[in-house]
Amino acid sequence: MAGRLKNKKTLITAAGQGIGRSTVLAFVCEGAQVLATDIDPDSLAILKEECPQIKTRLLDVTKTEAIQQLAEETGAIDVLFNCAGFVHHGTLLDCEESDWDFSFDLNVRSMYRMIRAFLPAMLESGRGSIVNMSSVASSVKGLPNRFVYGASKAAVVGLTKSVAMDFIK
């Protein structure tokens, strides 16, 4: 079933490694026009060598101005795949307030920033899909020693459902 994403203009965050990287490779195999973003220039360069048909862009998803600039330059996209995230290891007692703040900034607020920047053009064009990467750590059971990670990924589920209820027709 190759070609399911043929010519779909796609932006993927945290594309240099892990799930983001695998998503880039899978989307390219399905025919997507991929813009791969990451904060690590070396991982993007390696990805570009392996997949020369993609475009790459350095992007720190914790920086609203950088996201807004990219949205203005890019215009309407068909798929926004929010994959950036951070796993804090530990329980509530191991979690400092700074760990909580960083985890929620990267795992949740960055998705808010990306959606806020790219959704208007999607709505104007009458098309678009948003994928927000969550985790089984957000489930009813959760995972041990992933306190703030699980809490932040549960917030991703809530954010996703709220956006969907407001904008899916």
Describe these PLM feature segments:
Residues 95, 141-150, 162:
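Active-site loop-to-helix junction immediately N-terminal to the catalytic Tyr of the SDR YXXXK motif
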Residues 91-92, 99-104:
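Substrate-binding pocket helix/loop in short-chain dehydrogenase/reductase
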Residues 16-17:
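Conserved glycine-rich cofactor-binding loop
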Residues 135:
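Residue(s) in the substrate-gating loop at a strand-loop-helix junction
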